[in-house]
Amino acid sequence: MRNVVAALVWIAFASPLYAQSGTQAPPPAHTLSLAGPRVGMTFLSDGVVKKLHERSVDVSQNISQFGWQFERQFYSKQSGITALNEWVFLLGGLDQSVAIPSLSWMVGLRTREGAEFGVGPNVTPAGVALALAAGVTMRAGVLNVPMNFAVVPTKAGTRVTMLTGFTIRR
């Protein structure tokens, strides 16, 4: 009986020690907050224009976009790939005396060269849908200048948006 108790005590202390002897956890990922203005155009299919008209929003097929993007970059080491989390708030149609709100939450990746891709939900008065975006961010010193294209296919039709703006790296 004494040997059994000794063996159980040895096993109880050996397991936690073994678990602590494994490889070290990677260092915490560095994050960078980037936010800045966005400006661009959205091209609406006939079905989207009709859907907006049903909700008393009368616009042409091309509307202006003005807004703000909140971005958080997550990266580690110099691997070149950066994970992104973005919230994009836009007001469309200001050129036509209407304000159509839009909110997108995008999750994606950016390469060291600035090419980027993201996907996420988009909410507007025309409905809720999945947005697909791609683009490139050009850097000039501390200034980042993105050029992005997004496609939002819906039951009513398709929205295609082109946005640019800037952020400052701090």
Stretches found by the model and what they are:
Residues 1-29:
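Cleavable N-terminal export/targeting peptides
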Residues 19-67, 167-169:
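Short glycine/proline- and aromatic-enriched beta-strand/turn motifs that initiate or cap beta-hairpins
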Residues 23-33, 75-83, 114, 139-145, ...:
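Short loop/turn motifs that connect adjacent beta-strands in outer-membrane beta-barrel proteins
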Residues 77, 90-116:
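Mid-length scaffold segments of soluble, non-membrane domains
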Residues 83-93, 114-125, 143-153:
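Transmembrane beta-strand segments that form the barrel wall of outer-membrane beta-barrel proteins
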Residues 156-170:
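Outer-membrane beta-barrel "beta-signal"
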